[in-house]
Amino acid sequence: MVVEMNRLLFAIFIWIGCTLVRAEIGIISPAEANRLIESSDASVKPIVLDTRGGYKDYFRGHLPTAHHLNFDTLRGTQNGIPVEYLPDDITKALLIRAGVNRDRTHLIYATGDKLPNDEILSASMVAYVLEKYGVNDIRIVDGGLMKWQQEKLPVTQEYFGNPKGALPKFDSKQIGIDIDELLKRKNDPNVLLVDARPYNEYIGQDDIWLRKGHIPGAISFHWARLMAKDNTHEFLPFEQVKMVVKDAGLTPEREIIVYCGTSREGSLLRFYLKHVAKFPNVRLYEGSWKEYVTLKQHPAETLENKVR
């Protein structure tokens, strides 16, 4: 009886341990992220990635053990189009150099503040790239550095470099699509094309883009509607925005393709729908509007579309 009880307790202990460190993609509270960082168990210590573009921001202070991975190092000009995702071999080399590891949890963050601050998009873009290359244990720190500091958690100016990483053998490139697949899929009645940019860009009232408007058939859903007004790095609970999302026509039964200007805003909308709302089929058109505007054989429109 005692032996059987000991076996049961041991099994429960193992189950709890596995549950605490199980692989998943989603968000994590600052307190829980700090608990992982401070863990004495090397097997659960996370890879922490500070994705801010400004290196001086990293110098001013960052999460303990954070390795600075400027999000824009993962993009460059290709065929004359700026900020395209880099080729596979270069991207993989950069991720390995940053310590990305198939066997570890990855904590990703930027700063966070009111709009126009949009540094959460740096974090969601890096999370997208990691997921694309097969990493399945990724958490964005909810609220970013702003909330971390509000909760009086430790910040340091010490530098940290991760040891060489190791990527999974199999990638998940199906989470993104290229222009050819977009053109094939976008007119399917079960497909919903969603533009994650601000509404003024969607209807062409901006001074940014070579051509004005959006991809024909796309609806508008600005990514910031899913985030807290006083901190764009803080995710609103899905229950709080469920009706807003549904009323816009975004439902889990649809195949959803998101895009934006350069893919950062789209990466956030995809992350929320896929990993917070748990929609099963959400993909990102990686080229986004910056690529589409160069393809002048394909039309653009400025009239607003609604889901019927």
Outline where the language-model segments fall.
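Positively charged n-region of N-terminal signal peptides that target proteins for export
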Residues: 1-8
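Bacterial N-terminal signal peptides
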Residues: 9-19
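Positively charged, proline/Ser/Thr-rich regional signature most characteristic
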Residues: 24-103, 111-113, 185-248, 252, ...
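Active-site neighborhoods of enzymes that stabilize oxyanions during catalysis
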Residues: 27-30, 145-216, 297-308
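Terminal peptide-recognition signature
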Residues: 33, 66, 130, 148, ...
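Phosphate-coordinating loops and pocket residues in cytosolic domains that bind phosphorylated ligands
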Residues: 60, 150, 294
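Thiolate-centered catalytic microenvironments shared by cysteine-dependent enzyme domains
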Residues: 88-181, 265-282, 287-288
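C-terminal soluble interaction/assembly domains
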Residues: 233, 243, 248-305
